[in-house]
Amino acid sequence: MRPVLVVDFGSQYSQLVVRAIRECGYYAEFASPSISAAECLALSPIAIFLSGGPASAYKDNAPKLDEEILNCGIPVFGICYGFQLLAQAFGGSVKKANAPEYGPADITIVNKAFFSGQPDRQTVWMSHGDSVIRAPKNFCILSTSQDAVLSFCNRDRTIAGVQWHPEVKHSRFGKHTIKAFLSSFAAPNWDPEQTICGTVDSIRKTVGCKRVLCALSGGVDSVVAATLTHRAIGDRLRCVFVDHGLLRLNEREQVEEYCSSLGLNVSTYDASDCFLSALSGIRDSEQKRKVIGREFIACFSKLQERFDIKPHFLLQGTLYPDLVESGATPGGATIKSHHNVGGLSDNLGFELLEPLKYLFKDEVRKIGLQLGIPKHIVHRQPFPGPGLAIRIIGEVTNKKLSILRAADAIVRHELRDWTDIWQCPVILLSDVQSVGVRGDSRSCGFPIVIRPVSSDDAMTADWYRLPYDVLARISGRITNEIPEIVRVVLDITPKPPATIEWE
């Protein structure tokens, strides 16, 4: 499949560029700014998108694209910094803006090249401190503001760019613009629901006659990965659900029940004592993730002996956002380790099989429904592999886990019908003693944080506006039913700047 390459220059929105292109029906993946023209041509891309970034295109140390790529005949579209790079490369002028623009801005379309059917005046999302003040010679100016060029293209419309961020939902017509550019060169080639056969074939070819051990978490990602792999290799897949003692209330029983209904051969391994012992005394969130990753691998080594299986591959439900946040994409910075990416030991003893690692959550859900997985499983709220360990701020103990499980169960019960909430982590601030009043007497206890968010893909998120009466009912139940908790607070921070999980 010919990709659209997204060269990532460090924009906070780069992942959204990939997602927006896929939503337009074209397969997209990241490429490093260091990619050479020869490497690029070998991939036979439909087009190349240049992302935004924090650098200034006119500075000597600014990251650049191999200029031979611009002469290869491959269509190129620049966004923000990428737009400024194109202006600089073709003889235009880029300078520090009189005033930086961050947030919504009004633009005027003066040429409909890629804006057919769009209003002449529209609001877009800006995030830049530099501006293109002169377009390259023989380029057509497509939109302007009072003192800057906001978009342009060359005469044959194969080189184009915009100063704003069409990938951000606040740019209402952004995806229309992206699709208008791409459709000039190729028909759509991406539908996640149509990739099932290709993924099954790829798994079959990769695995050959070997065996696969699945680290089943019970979430939609691992269930879809297991279902696809089972289609590919049948009973040579062995699924193991590791109870690490960090699960939510009754989660083990629920996972066993619905995995059985899907026909998956699942064995449960209780490793809670091992995990809790390894986590003893650890307060740092990154260290928790690393320890949990190592313990998982240790578990799988023991499982080979217990169940007399000698798998070559370890199957995981790693997704594209996991790779991005772990810095595993070209040029990516590490935001936090994921137990199924950066938290794994270098000496696995297994070869990783990650059939979903280039997919977003919504794409996995579409595939899950196509596979016939029940809707309530497909739309289950995401739950991190390290479980409640990263929702306890401080050391993890059995007592704290019991408190958090009870609070989490209350929140999930009260929000069971709120299907448009992407996720609602419940966090125990176990290193904080908060003062309360009970029975006319002073009391002390833990604060609990609830964090309901709305999102499309977990790359960005906004806090969910729950009605006050729902919040009051949640707070009342938690403080009345769990004596160790004296305070309930609401996290109203979007992502960015905060991640969805606290740790």
Swiss-Prot record:
- Give all residue intervals belonging to the GMPS ATP-PPase domain: 190-380
What does this protein do, in the record's words? Answer: Catalyzes the synthesis of GMP from XMP.
Q: What is the gene name?
A: guaA
Q: Name one Pfam family in it.
A: NAD_synthase
Q: Which domain of life is it from?
A: Bacteria
Enzyme class label = ligase
Q: Which UniProt keywords apply?
A: ATP-binding, Glutamine amidotransferase, GMP biosynthesis, Ligase, Nucleotide-binding, Purine biosynthesis
Name the EC number(s).
6.3.5.2
Q: Name one GO cellular component term.
A: cytosol
GO molecular-function annotation terms?
A: ATP binding; GMP synthase activity
Q: Which protein is depicted?
A: GMP synthase [glutamine-hydrolyzing]
Tell me if Cell inner membrane is a UniProt keyword of this record: no
InterPro entries per record: Class_I_gatase-like, GATASE, GMP_synth_C, GMP_synth_GATase, GMP_synthase, GMPS_ATP_PPase_dom, NAD/GMP_synthase, Rossmann-like_a/b/a_fold
Q: Does the keyword Nucleotide-binding apply?
A: yes
